Structure formats: C-alpha cells, structure tokens
C-alpha cells in the first residue's frame, strides 16, 4: 500500500479516536466536525430519519448525553475502498439505565480532515429508561 494510503488510513483512524476520546472525557471540542456536518443517530432529538445539521446542534446534543455516558472502549476500525470514510466498532457504557451499547459509528471525512457526515448505528432500546 502506498505511503499516502497508509497516511490517509491513519488520519481516518485518528479522527475516529478523537471522537471516542471526546465521549470518554465528556469534551467534544477537539472533534473535527465540519460546520455543516450531518449526523444521524437513533437517540437524536428527531430520531434516526431526521439528521442533526450543523456543528453547534451536534455539540449541544452530545453535551446532553454526558451525564449518562460511562466507559468507552474502541474495538476496531473499518475503512471504505476510497479511504473517505471510517467505521469504528466500540462499546459505549451508559450509566442510567446501566447498559453497554454495541456501536458502529461511521464518519465520512473530507480532504481537509473534517467530518462531513456521521451515522451512529446501535440498538437504543436498552438505553431508554423504562416508563413507570
């Protein structure tokens, strides 16, 4: 594999790991989201079908999750053929209700190293508190 492909793969991996480190540290300020990033997640305010658009909205949503985030463990990374996206398998601990989400988050990254699209894949049912 040519050096530029290795470098691109390492760059994608580093961007993903910055994201997961941000979750673990409850500080997403280092995550390189593009200003017009599009993020889809099952627990997003409008659900999976309606994406959050824009870095400010994404930051605000992640900050709302901080109180229930527990241990974060990155397991492995997968790359698309043209090295424009990385998907990372991780375990994301939730403290209330206590559970572990088995997650695959996909990041599309532009040539400037900014995340332009993100899609989070997990089954959210165990993270939703039971209603009384």
Regions found by a protein language model. Name each.
Residues 7, 50-53:
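Alpha-helix N-cap and loop-to-helix initiation/capping positions
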Residues 13, 17, 56-59, 63:
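Generic alpha-helical structural signal
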Residues 2-7, 59-132:
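A beta-strand edge to alpha-helix "cap/lid" segment located at domain peripheries
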Residues 29-30, 78:
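Short secondary-structure boundary/capping segments
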Residues 26-28, 55, 112:
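Residues at or immediately preceding the N-termini of alpha-helices
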Residues 1-28, 35, 130-132:
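Short, low-complexity N-terminal intrinsically disordered segments enriched in polar/charged residues
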């Amino acid at each position: 594999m040519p050096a530029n492909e290795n470098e691109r793969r390492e760059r994608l991996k580093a961007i993903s790991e910055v994201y997961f480190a941000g979750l673990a540290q409850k500080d997403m300020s280092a995550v390189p989201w593009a200003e017009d990033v599009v993020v889809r997640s099952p627990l997003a305010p409008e659900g999976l079908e309606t994406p959050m658009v824009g870095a400010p909205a994404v930051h605000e949503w992640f900050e709302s999750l901080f109180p229930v985030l527990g241990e974060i463990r990155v397991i492995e990374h997968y790359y698309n053929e043209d090295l424009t996206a990385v998907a990372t398998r991780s375990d994301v601990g939730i403290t209330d209700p206590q559970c572990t989400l088995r997650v695959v988050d996909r990041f599309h990254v532009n040539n400037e190293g900014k995340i332009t699209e993100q899609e989070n894949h997990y089954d959210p049912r165990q993270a939703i508190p039971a209603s009384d």
